[in-house]
């Protein structure tokens, strides 16, 4: 198995990505030269008779320049992994699947439960974490043979709900899903093999949404899924996108579970894992399909 720790020549789509990388680096260097010329010109030509205004303007331009530099270094080189993932060598491990629910309509939740019952993997168990305490959701969970748990008090919103799930389960790997995210039957089998590399703490998959034709409002979030995540993946620093993400329980426990102070617990838990030496992997193919605003 090669998840990026072996030589670059063996990477998935290596030749294609290398050509794109060379082109991107040329464009980045040209942009860097142009930016340096502009900043140099700006320092000389700012009206320094108003030093506070001039300093604020120069500072704002420098912040923009640094942002462009960081974006350029991140986007210049990308890494992808094969669509089929990597097979688990030996007996496949148990995976806990958390479906976080909070007052979503039944017609939204049911297709997700149906898809969860059709996952093609021998050892997984589903727990419905219902912060809405809806009797109809509990009935559906029983109908499909899934575990159901509803907290007495909804402390810390989704983060608290996921941490509650961690407290009542024990599998070494955890897959998190939102209520509207209908999973692919092979979602577990395509992601689990990455964890044979012991330093990998999470694997984040691409989310796809049921969008109007042409995606007029840009809800596909192509910048994130087609540019940012593949670029961060090259540095082993891909981040969790919250749903359709598999975590190593040990990695979650090493950072105290999902952070409860932030509304973007997926991003922050990724940063905490990076600080502890865990790596994030991005799987660039569709494994879930959710809903998005239509107007």
Language-model regions, residue ranges each:
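N-terminal membrane-anchoring/stem segments of glycan-assembly enzymes
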Residues: 1-91, 141
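Cell-envelope/extracellular polymer assembly enzymes that use nucleotide-activated donors
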Residues: 93-96, 125, 268
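A conserved hydrophobic helix/loop-capping motif in glycosyltransferases and polysaccharide synthases
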Residues: 96-104, 119, 194
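A conserved acidic beta->alpha catalytic loop
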Residues: 122, 130-137, 153-154
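Long helical/loop segments within the catalytic core of UDP-sugar-dependent glycosyltransferases
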Residues: 150, 154-173, 184-263, 274-275, ...
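Acidic donor-binding loop at a coil-to-helix junction in glycosyltransferase catalytic cores
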Residues: 263-269
């Amino acid at each position: 198995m090669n998840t990026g720790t072996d030589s670059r020549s063996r990477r998935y789509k290596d030749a294609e990505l290398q050509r794109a990388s060379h082109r991107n680096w040329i464009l980045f260097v040209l942009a860097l030269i142009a930016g340096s010329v502009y900043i140099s010109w700006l320092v000389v030509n700012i009206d320094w008779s108003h030093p506070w205004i001039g300093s604020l303007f120069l500072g704002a331009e420098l912040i923009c320049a640094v942002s462009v530099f960081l974006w350029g270094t991140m986007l210049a080189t990308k890494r992808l992994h094969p669509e089929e993932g990597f097979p688990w060598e030996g007996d496949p491990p148990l995976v806990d699947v958390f479906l976080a629910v909070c007052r979503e309509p039944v017609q939204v939740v049911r297709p997700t439960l149906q898809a969860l019952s059709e996952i093609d993997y021998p050892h997984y168990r589903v727990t419905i974490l219902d912060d809405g305490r809806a009797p109809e959701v509990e009935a559906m969970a029983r109908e499909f043979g899934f575990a159901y748990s509803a907290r007495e008090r909804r402390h810390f919103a989704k983060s608290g709900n996921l941490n509650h799930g961690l407290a009542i389960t024990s599998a070494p790997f955890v897959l998190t899903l939102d209520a509207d995210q209908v999973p692919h039957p092979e979602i577990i089998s395509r992601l689990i093999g990455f964890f044979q590399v012991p330093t990998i703490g999470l694997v984040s998959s691409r989310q796809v949404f049921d969008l109007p034709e042409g995606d007029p409002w840009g809800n596909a979030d192509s910048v994130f899924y087609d540019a940012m995540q593949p670029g961060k993946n090259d540095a082993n620093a891909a981040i969790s996108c919250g749903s359709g993400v598999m975590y190593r329980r040990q990695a979650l426990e090493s950072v105290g579970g999902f952070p409860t102070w932030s509304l973007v617990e997926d991003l922050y838990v990724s940063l905490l894992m990076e600080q502890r030496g865990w790596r994030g992997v991005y799987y660039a193919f569709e494994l879930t399909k959710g809903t998005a605003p239509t107007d």
